[in-house]
Amino acid sequence: MRALVLAAIAAFGLALGGCQREGETEQAPNVRRSTIVEPETRNVDVVPQEEPAVARQQWRASSESARTVSGNLRVSLVGPRGGPVVFAFANGITIQAQPYAVVPANSRSGVGGQSYAAVIGGDPRVNAWLFRVQAENVATSAVQGGLCTTDRTRFLAVSEFVDAGGRWVFKIAAFSGEGEPGERPTLCNAYAFTAQ
């Protein structure tokens, strides 16, 4: 009998507890039923790049054309940033050039419908700096001639960036003729260098 009384008290207590909850104003938390996916706003695939001649000046020839025609490279500013840049090659070629434009490397170069990245052999996610050559001096020690061999180099397209191997690289495309890059230029050759 004692067990029956205890069971009845327990049942009454539970029923009373349930009745008291009805009067409370607290509601269950509101749970959102749909998932919202937002795109990541930061660029996780950005390729580190630099303006030529600012952070690094000495470069080792890494392509066959650079080893045979130009040799290693030293790049330096003549004055403040935005002014002329001197490209001094170990094989006796010296070029002074004035930057005149910065374009995305994936834009058209005017060479057979190719982008600057394709012409230079660079990364399409970086910029290409376009230079107008002011002076080109070719020493007699430069057996192959200048960057455009016997023709005068008129324009350069340059990119400095970190490649897939994690190395800083410097890529140059040399153009002869009157047409600027982007307007039917005559591509002479492309040269590749790695940081020393």
Where are these regions (language model features)?
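Bacterial signal peptide processing site
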Residues: C19-E22
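Sec-dependent bacterial lipoprotein signal peptides
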Residues: M1-G17
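Beta-strand-rich cores of mature extracytoplasmic or soluble domains
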Residues: V119-Q196
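N-terminal low-complexity, Pro/Thr-rich disordered segments
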Residues: E26-D45
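Tryptophan-anchored aromatic micro-motifs
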Residues: N43-R67
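Short, solvent-exposed loop/hinge segments that bridge or flank secondary-structure elements
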Residues: A61-T94, G113, T140-D151
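Short, solvent-exposed coil/turn segments at beta-strand boundaries
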Residues: A53-R56, R74-P84, E160-V169, Q196
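Central antiparallel beta-sheet cores of small beta-barrel/beta-sandwich binding domains
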Residues: G82-D123
